[in-house]
């Protein structure tokens, strides 16, 4: 059969990487100008693939808005191919819902520009891909995925080498854990195998002999794929002339300036009946381990933590809150703006922390804009909701507190909020005297009561005097000073999405009931609640006794420091091989807080480590020595690193909260926290995208890298069959299982980008204050059988508390939009539909068996099963529906 060579012109566009965004944008404008001219002058130049993303159009049209009609025309003609993504994201370091928003807004852009062509799941350079990608794509009607990494190893020089784990063909079947399948197209010869095609006959002869042979080696059909482009590659203007030369030299091959639509149509007609099936995540599991790029999970951890905060704000607070307000279009517009701004930080070279320092400084500003904007929006919209509620109380002195519950699950937790007991505005008296006047006020005793619950346990502390201001919608700003209280209360709610009003009521009688403090004997360095007992040791490590099982987890929280002579992409241990730990430290321990609802202990340790790598590392960096071949050790000069660890135990909590502050004074090193689980079994679990995946503790025999690090989203869990320990983190995405211990990376300090040149990155050393937050959750059995992952997902999402005035609003004291049940199911989305006509709820089932989902809502007329793109599939019922959620299935319901 005659071979067909499909030549697809493209440019893989890293929006920011070895230059800042604006530097790369200059060349994007050149590329697009040249491309539009080529479309106009060369009718044989059929199409150009815009790297699977739509943000490139925004970046271009912001500079050249007059080109929009021309761009739109070529998109509608099928010559300029965009989407389906808004940006080419890193798959593992962005949340499940962020991956879906990326697809939603990308598809919306393609429809806005009038693109009619079917989409492909495009992952040309993604640093590994989550296992549920086939299910997500299939639910969006996308039946093929193109990817360059994850099955065969890829080096920093962007060359892919064949490996037995990959399919023998470029074409394969990729299956998600739930059984969903897509056709997988492996870019086995990388996304530049047809780059810069010669027009000179002699050069073309040499070029095509090699390229055709390489492509035929992996092709299961007569259709051969050649990607005519590479990173930031200018469009090849004479590619159609080069094709004519090739046709003359190789008459037995049909050379075609093509696109993915035509290529996929052709190969589907010829695919063999039996293709290799690859199931689940693609992480280079069976390679030598040196080119996985997994340690981007720990480069510049501060970026990952900011991203986690922003994703949580948008997914778990701002979007659900939209369903409680009248002006849903305002919410929808702000939500899209904040999501798109946040996703500017989600390309792999951005969120992975593997770019030059200037790129990541700009990222910090974007995160700050999203966080500040979303926080303001939530606060102001919360005030508008609160102003509509009936907040009258028998006592005129009662302070109404509206609790907005937006996480979509019921449950109990300890809530902390600052309340203005008394405000004095600057227009009421001379501002210079206000603080003293406020300090004279005697703080009364308070109780907190809810109309449907009565009084709840509460702790109140004087928080002093604070400056603030109001911004009335119909007037000039009003500055004030306020006397504040810090109110901590136990909140047990059966709300899923809604609000209820509580009242902070002053009472004359003093508290007489004795409340048991969580630290009974301060000299014993022990915290204890109903579920666990925490014993702190002299070296600063601690043990947890799970009171429900009687199992003790010993010597948790020892810190380990080793040299790192790698780069932003990959960790490489220094050649000295020395581990420095806090095991022999003498820690200082002090109580920060101790009451009936919450206790916090601070542990302070000093660890002496080498100040940097030795001078050999500089030489190896300058000579571009590949990281596995480096031999540098650590310097003789020493420096002290101060670690401050806060352990917090709350009433009723099943987990111990840990906050670590590292004052980093060293370079070229990695610091981890160690959590042993005695007699751990050979596999463990980690949170991924719509999946809790099971992974082996030890690598495949082909693995040569001494380190076997992994990605996680929210949690990692290790058990011994009877008892387990789950660690739920906030923005910590790297771990390793080492000798029956979970090692969580808290800090990684390196000084260069890596890859194809020498790009120094001194800010990637992360000097100064570094924070890490996580929760330790002991349990019986494994993480799935114990359902402990539900608490892990819920931990970052706190209720929003709004202080308001007493008023006779039209809304009742409490409202709940829906309720649901389904043991072990995880709710990931609670948002307005993109078209503004209803509500979207999404769950996934992490378990290996099916589960019934029951949903009730009296606020909507119809309930539909929906695609991931929020399109109706079938009507399920009205107020009450029950469906079966298959093992590891993602389910989306649409309410109208």
From Swiss-Prot:
It catalyses: (2R)-2-O-(6-phospho-alpha-D-mannosyl)-glycerate + H2O = alpha-D-mannose 6-phosphate + (R)-glycerate. One of its GO terms (biological process) is mannose metabolic process. The active site is at residue 125. It is an enzyme of class 3 (hydrolase). Keywords: Glycosidase, Hydrolase, Metal-binding. Binds 1 divalent metal cation per subunit. One of its GO terms (molecular function) is metal ion binding. Its cofactor is a divalent metal cation. A divalent metal cation binds at residues 12, 14, 125, 348. It comes from the Bacteria. Disulfide bonds: none annotated. InterPro entries: Gal_mutarotase_sf_dom, GH38_beta-1, GH38_C, Glyco_hydro/deAcase_b/a-brl, Glyco_hydro_38_C, Glyco_hydro_38_cen, Glyco_hydro_38_cen_sf, Glyco_hydro_38_N. Gene3D superfamilies: 2.60.40.2210, 2.60.40.2220, Glycoside hydrolase 38, N terminal domain (3.20.110.10), Glycoside hydrolase family 38, central domain (1.20.1270.50), Golgi alpha-mannosidase II, domain 4 (2.70.98.30). Its EC number is 3.2.1.-. May hydrolyze 6-phospho-mannosyl-D-glycerate to mannose-6-phosphate and glycerate. Belongs to the glycosyl hydrolase 38 family. This is Putative mannosylglycerate hydrolase. It comes from Halalkalibacterium halodurans (strain ATCC BAA-125 / DSM 18197 / FERM 7344 / JCM 9153 / C-125). The gene is mngB.
């Amino acid at each position: 059969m005659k071979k067909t060579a499909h030549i697809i012109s493209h440019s893989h566009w890293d929006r920011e990487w070895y230059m800042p965004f604006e530097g790369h944008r200059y060349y994007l404008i050149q590329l697009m100008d040249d491309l539009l001219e080529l479309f106009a002058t060369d009718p044989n130049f059929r199409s150009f693939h815009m790297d699977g993303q739509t943000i490139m159009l925004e970046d271009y049209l912001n500079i050249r808005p007059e080109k929009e009609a021309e761009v739109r025309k070529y998109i509608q003609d099928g010559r300029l191919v965009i989407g389906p993504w808004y940006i080419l994201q890193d798959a593992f370091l962005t949340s499940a819902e962020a991956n879906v928003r990326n697809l939603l807004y990308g598809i919306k852009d393609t429809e806005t520009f009038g693109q009619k062509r079917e989409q492909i799941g495009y992952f040309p350079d993604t640093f590994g891909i989550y296992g549920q990608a086939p299910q997500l794509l299939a639910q969006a009607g996308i039946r093929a995925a193109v990817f360059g990494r994850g099955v065969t190893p890829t080096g920093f020089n962007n060359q892919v080498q064949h490996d037995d784990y990959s399919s023998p063909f470029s074409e394969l079947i990729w299956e998600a854990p739930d059984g969903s399948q897509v056709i997988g197209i492996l870019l086995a010869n990388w996304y530049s195998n047809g780059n810069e095609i010669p027009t000179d006959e002699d050069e073309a002869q040499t070029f095509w002999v090699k390229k055709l042979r390489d492509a035929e080696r992996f092709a299961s059909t007569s259709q051969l794929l050649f990607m005519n482009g590479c990173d930031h590659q200018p469009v090849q203007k004479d590619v159609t002339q080069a094709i004519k030369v090739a046709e003359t030299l190789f008459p037995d091959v049909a050379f075609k300036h093509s696109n993915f639509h035509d290529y996929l149509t052709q190969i589907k007609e010829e695919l063999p009946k039996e293709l290799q099936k690859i199931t689940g995540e693609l992480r280079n599991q069976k390679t030598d381990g040196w080119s996985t790029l997994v340690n981007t999970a720990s480069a510049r951890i501060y970026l990952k933590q900011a991203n986690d905060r922003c994703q949580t704000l948008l997914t778990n607070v701002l979007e659900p809150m939209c369903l409680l307000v009248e002006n849903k279009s305002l919410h929808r517009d702000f939500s899209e703006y904040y999501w798109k701004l946040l996703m500017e930080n989600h390309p792999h070279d951005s969120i992975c922390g593997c770019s030059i320092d200037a790129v990541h400084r700009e990222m910090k500003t974007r995160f700050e804009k999203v966080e500040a904007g979303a926080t303001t929006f939530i606060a102001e919209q919360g005030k508008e909701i609160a102003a509509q509620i009936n907040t009258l109380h028998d006592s005129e002195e009662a302070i109404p507190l509206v609790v907005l519950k937006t996480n979509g699950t019921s449950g109990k937790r300890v809530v902390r909020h600052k309340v203005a007991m008394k405000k004095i505005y600057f227009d009421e008296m001379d501002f210079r005297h206000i603080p003293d006047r406020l300090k004279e006020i005697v703080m009364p005793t308070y109780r907190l009561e809810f109309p449907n619950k009565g009084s709840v346990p509460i702790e109140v502390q004087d928080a002093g005097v604070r400056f603030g201001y109001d911004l009335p919608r119909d007037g000039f700003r009003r500055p004030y000073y306020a006397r504040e209280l810090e109110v901590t209360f136990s909140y047990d709610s059966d709300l899923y999405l809604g609000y209820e009003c509580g009242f902070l009521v002053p009472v004359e009688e003093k508290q007489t009931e004795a409340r048991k403090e969580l630290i009974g004997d301060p000299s014993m360095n022990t915290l204890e609640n109903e579920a666990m007992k925490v014993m702190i040791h002299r070296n600063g490590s601690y043990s947890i006794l799970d009171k429900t099982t009687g199992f003790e987890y010993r010597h948790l929280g020892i810190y380990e420091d080793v040299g790192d002579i790698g780069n932003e992409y990959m960790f490489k241990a220094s050649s000295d091989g020395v581990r420095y730990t806090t095991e022999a430290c003498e820690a200082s321990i002090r109580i920060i807080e101790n009451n009936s609802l919450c206790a916090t202990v601070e542990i302070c340790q000093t660890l002496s480590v080498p100040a940097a790598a030795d001078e050999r590392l500089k030489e190896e960096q300058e000579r571009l020595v590949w990281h596995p071949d480096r031999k540098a050790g650590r310097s003789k000069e020493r420096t002290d690193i101060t670690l401050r660890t806060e352990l917090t135990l709350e009433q009723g909590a099943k987990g111990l909260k840990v906050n670590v502050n590292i004052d980093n004074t060293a370079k070229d090193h990695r610091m981890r926290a160690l959590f042993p689980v005695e007699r751990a079994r050979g596999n463990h679990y980690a949170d991924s995208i719509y999946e809790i995946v099971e992974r082996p503790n030890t690598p495949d025999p082909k693995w040569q890298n001494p380190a076997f690090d992994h990605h996680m989203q929210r949690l990692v869990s290790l058990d011994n069959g009877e008892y387990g320990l789950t660690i739920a983190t906030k923005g910590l995405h790297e771990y390793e299982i080492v000798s029956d211990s979970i090692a969580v990376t808290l800090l990684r300090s390196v000084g260069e980008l890596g890859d194809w040149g020498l790009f120094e990155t001194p800010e990637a050393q992360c000097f100064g204050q570094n924070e890490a937050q996580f929760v330790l959750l002991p349990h019986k059995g494994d993480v799935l059988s114990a359902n402990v992952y539900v608490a892990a997902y819920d931990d970052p999402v706190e209720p929003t508390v709004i202080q308001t005035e007493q008023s006779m609003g039209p809304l009742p004291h409490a409202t709940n939009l829906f309720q649901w049940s389904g043991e072990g199911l995880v709710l990931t989305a609670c948002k307005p539909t993109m078209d503004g006509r209803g509500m979207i709820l999404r769950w996934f089932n992490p378990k290996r068996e099916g589960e019934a989902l029951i949903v009730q809502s009296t606020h909507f007329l119809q309930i539909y099963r929906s695609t991931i793109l929020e399109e109706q599939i079938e009507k399920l019922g009205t107020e009450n529906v029950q469906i079966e959620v298959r093992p590891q299935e993602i389910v989306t319901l649409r309410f109208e």
